[in-house]
Amino acid sequence: MYTVDLAYVGRGLHEELVAHIADQQGYYADEGVHVALRDGCSWDEERLRRGATIGLGRALLSRLTDGIPWVALHVNTTRPLFWFLARPGPLRPGPASLADLAGRRLAVHAPRTAPGCFTRIVLRRAGLDPDRDIHTVVRPPGDYGMDLRRLHDGSIDAALVGSTMAPEAIAAEHGWQVLAWVGDHFQIPTVGVAVDPTYIHPDDPAVRAVVRAHRRALRVIHGEPDTTVRHMQTFLGRHTADEVRAHYETFVAPYFTAGGEADLAVGAGAITAVATELGVPATVTAAEFYRTAATAPD
């Protein structure tokens, strides 16, 4: 049996769902690979690049800024699962759109992380300068629980939250509002499987086995809603079964890929946007970074 380390670099469905299904359904074992799932959220690039990673957004930023030659071999979705969640204030109505975040306090990821970069792209497209128009509160996201506490106590007006929760259900529960889904405003082939060929060849049999297992997990997502919702409840334990199913039907089933291949046109536009936001040249093409066509089923 082959072995490989596979690191996730964020929390929630966006990062973990496909690998979780592949593990729990026994697909890794079926494909003859032992996968050690690692928490790489706090790892530096040198440690991360010695195994496979799920975080394609972070891998792309690393390739553009540090020259680490990551390649993506499998893509789960082109719609990042992050949302702008806002509360009403005591003296004025809460923001109703992204443009209304002007002058507000927004909890966000650091600018040179993948979610932080994506957020800044979306804010600029809404006509906002993230450095001048908004009071940004940069924090490590964790499971976003502290963001909910700060929204409750009024120390922030809005937060960029991820998929450790169903934000539309949280908003309904507390009388808050989901201003926007990042995936509606910025598309990028993101989360999947990536490797640095310096350490792991893209055709390494262990990696190919992981890709096959993840492809099978995607088939579950599209063909077995009840099974997928059951797995999603592992991550969304604070929500009812109906809320989890609604979240699946709205954000997961329509947008996760069928077979793990990247849309290179979407990828090209995303690389240009990310490089522009980072202030670096776009030194890699979509075809060079997204090698998913080369990992067709064996």
Regions found by a protein language model. Give the residues of each.
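Short, glycine-/small- and polar/acidic-enriched structural segments
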Residues: 2-131, 135-138, 147, 157-163, ...
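Short Gly/Pro-enriched turn/cap motifs at secondary-structure boundaries
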Residues: 10, 183, 262-263
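Pocket-lining segment of extracytoplasmic ligand-binding domains
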Residues: 59, 146-234
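Secondary-structure end/capping motifs
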Residues: 203-280
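Conserved C-terminal helix/tail region of periplasmic/extracytoplasmic solute-binding proteins
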Residues: 271-298
